Amino acid sequence: MEELKGYLEKSRSKQQHFLYPLLFQEYIFVLAHDHGLNVNGSIFYEPAEISGYDKKFSSLLVKRLITRMYQQNYLINSVNDSNQNRFVGHNKNFDSQMISEGFAVIVEIPFSLRLVSSLEEKKEIQKSQNLRSIHSIFPFFEDKLSHLICVLDILIPYPVHLEILVQILQCWIQDVPSLHLLRFFFHEYNNWSNLITPKKSNYYGFSKENPRLFLFLYNSYVVECESIFVFLRKQSSYLRSTSSGTFLERTHFHEKIEQHLVVLCCNDFQKTLWLFKDPFMHYVRYQGKSILASKGTRFLMKKWKSYFVNFWQCHFHFWSQSCRIHINQFPNFSLHFLGYLSSVPINPSAVKSQMLENSFLIDTVTKKFETLVPIISMIGSLSKAKFCNVSGNPISKPVWADLSDSDIIDRFGRICRNLSHYYSGSSKKQSLYRIKYILRLSCARTLARKHKSTVRAFLQRLGSEFLEEFFTEEEKVLSLILPRISYPLHKLYRERIWYLDIIRINDLVNHL
């Protein structure tokens, strides 16, 4: 990082802001290799079909690549050769992937340095901001949503044209060659005329090919989408909210730099600010879904909906479907967010009061925030993973039948404990018990299939030890959190428990 600071200070003294030359530095590719975000393993492991060696990390490949990039028209020639050396294509050329991941490191540098400088100015680093659990959102819901009326359920639209993403980065990165190289990546990857379209194949393919660059671009786009909230909070005395300094995505070290966002939005939204003065506005986002809750009327939320649509159309120059924003009103609404089905039902109750010889009934209404396991969606996810059929009946998983008995039980038990861990905050545990039952019986069917036996005979042979694999670890965790609980643990399962160490959603939950 110190070397990067020195380079940028030298560049700044010459009135230049060039990041492109960093692509010719070997340590940039080392940083990309150490990042470890590539789901298929690092690209810096030389493929056996290219070198004839086993998959080993080789700095020699990086040096050869840098030497070739110094050659004139290397990139142009690599694109014209469509057989083996295509820069970006279906064959996943080794050199192109190396350059792509190195470029992802380069474009992150200005944001990382800006974050470090901002933390140095504050003279304090709040590590809890980066380690905050996903579950911390639900106590916030419980405290706020029960007092609110309307909710906007928003699916953040995708940018239709790739040039939008380039223009967003252009506000922060003044290096024109780097922006041209970014355009080059987009246009040459599967002939992308659109980066993100209703067809999921291109979007999904690019995210798998280079997750680091993809997440960086997506985060930049989301920051731009959320810039309106920063502006309203800064400019309006009626919108009082505390800034938590939240990082964009937990796998990246970027921060929303609010003062820059205000500059971007100041000219666009000042005239319409008076429409949305609301002291009870709360906004929460995770990935591509966000909610905006308010104590205002349905008419106010219609204004917000219209404003969002116009904002996306005017600021990002693409047509946004209004159906991506739903106006809902408590208590006749259930919110799907972070794998939970949340609602605020009204619970009527009657209290009998007696004063001297007179007695009377007092009807009261209370609101309680409830979080439920979306059992239908979960069964769909379990069905996709081949643990049950679409009706929720457990089936064997033949793919795991070749594993040892301990490995099979360990895999099923780990999934069961992870889901129990994540859904520990559920108000009603019946759906969670059903999921455990599906996984437990699917495990028994898989073991019975392996040993060519019946499920009944196999369960009789295993006895209670089979069940302990699914619950022992969970009981240990609960006993550490609530050591003074004296009543049985089966009563403890009725309580809602929010954990502070969950930083990502389980893969099965992510299918929802």
Swiss-Prot record:
What Pfam families has UniProt attached to this entry?
A: Intron_maturas2, MatK_N
UniProt name for this protein? Maturase K
What is the residue range of the signal peptide feature?
none
Species assigned in the record: Filarum manserichense
Q: Enumerate the subcellular locations listed in this protein's record, separating them with semicolons.
A: Plastid, Chloroplast
As for family, the record states:
Belongs to the intron maturase 2 family. MatK subfamily.
Q: Name one GO biological process term.
A: RNA splicing
Any one of the GO CC terms: chloroplast
GO MF, one example: RNA binding
State the UniProt keywords alphabetically.
Chloroplast, mRNA processing, Plastid, RNA-binding, tRNA processing
